[in-house]
Amino acid sequence: MPSNATDALAIAQDLLRCPSVTPADAGALGVLERLLHAAGFAVHRVTFSEPGTADIDNLYARIGTTAPHICFAGHTDVVPPGDEAAWSHDAFAGEVHDGLLYGRGAVDMKGGIACSVAAVLQHLATHGGQPHESGQGSISFLITGDEEDVAVNGTVKLLQWAAARGETFDHCVLGEPSNVEALGDTIKIGRRGSLSGTLIVDGVQGHVAYPHRASNPVPDIAALIVALGAEPLDAGTDTFQPSNLEFTSVDVGNPATNVIPAQARAKFNIRFNDRHSAESLQTLIEARVQAACGNRIRARIDWQPSNAGAFVTKPGAFTDLVAAAIEDVTGRKPELNTGGGTSDARFITHYCPVIEFGLVGQTMHKIDERTPVADLETLTQIYRGVLQRYFA
């Protein structure tokens, strides 16, 4: 356990020293379990399985039994460190140098979890060991070890497990690194959806000297790529930027220079706003492909399953409360933003309003991932401000 159980830096260092490269836990959830159990939380460790994937350990802890109920969510798994020799400091040592805490997960998101735990423990220590002196209210932690990989045995199943137990949540703070430049500049109130597919064009293989005996899919797939990018998917909304389709690879699997290939494939991803669902986008894209094919090109799309729909937490009392806590500590009025990639908030939104607010994300997933120690202290103060206002 940390030498100071309510100190965010000490908690973060203990977490960073657990090399929990997804799907490994490496003791990270145990660090949290010991801290929360000692503070009076009812702590549950739950393992979920899925054929073809690793078994994943998860943690759910709650103190209090009544509303209002605020949940802090997050993940303790991290991406691989890459070339560890390229790191200035050991990726799993949790070392501080020149006021910066180094380590894989310092930003994404062990640092954020450490701040939320420290803030909650400090809050409880000044409120008689309860969310509110009256005994009303609940605080919980919903922590998974399966976010950075396939995300099938983590938050999505932990929420289902909690709901089956009768757990209900009023609001959730997900401590992902939401800030762009400085702590306090951004609250994520939603995320775009994500849909991936492979455009496949069938041709007829043949010798390049006899093109009339073959059908070359390469110029055909190039024409379809141009056609799909020619017209915007939408113009955006009040809370989302326009949906965007990006091709990420074009492949024919043909090492020869004298053979017309039989097939061409192009992979793409769409980041979409709340004007679409995955199903409506599939219909739209397939219609555009067929229109561009005419009666000559033979094309189809192989869609990947998507569990990442667009969502937004409408600005209101809860976002105002969090923004006020941020401005009170940092002096910054945060932007309410829906940019970036997907997160586990896409699962949480089906159970309660959720916002994302954590550290600054500039070094996440990079060599020498790091965060200023001062930011850990500031984020802890902000979370404490959220709790003070929430249980006022």
Swiss-Prot record:
Cofactor note: Binds 2 Zn(2+) or Co(2+) ions per subunit.
GO MF entries: acetylornithine deacetylase activity; cobalt ion binding; succinyl-diaminopimelate desuccinylase activity; zinc ion binding
Binding site for Zn(2+) 2: 108, 148, 365
Reaction it catalyzes: N-succinyl-(2S,6S)-2,6-diaminopimelate + H2O = (2S,6S)-2,6-diaminopimelate + succinate
Biological pathway: Amino-acid biosynthesis; L-lysine biosynthesis via DAP pathway; LL-2,6-diaminopimelate from (S)-tetrahydrodipicolinate (succinylase route): step 3/3
Record-linked InterPro entries: Bact_exopeptidase_dim_dom, DapE_proteobac, Peptidase_M20, Peptidase_M20_dimer, Peptidase_M20A
Cofactor or coenzyme needed: Zn(2+); Co(2+)
Residues where Zn(2+) 1 binds: 75, 108, 176
A Pfam family assignment: Peptidase_M20
Top EC class for this record: hydrolase
Gene3D superfamilies per UniProt: Zn peptidases (3.40.630.10)
This enzyme's EC code(s): 3.5.1.18
Family assignment from sequence similarity: Belongs to the peptidase M20A family. DapE subfamily.
Subunit structure: Homodimer.
Protein name: Succinyl-diaminopimelate desuccinylase
Species this protein is from: Rhodopseudomonas palustris (strain BisB18)
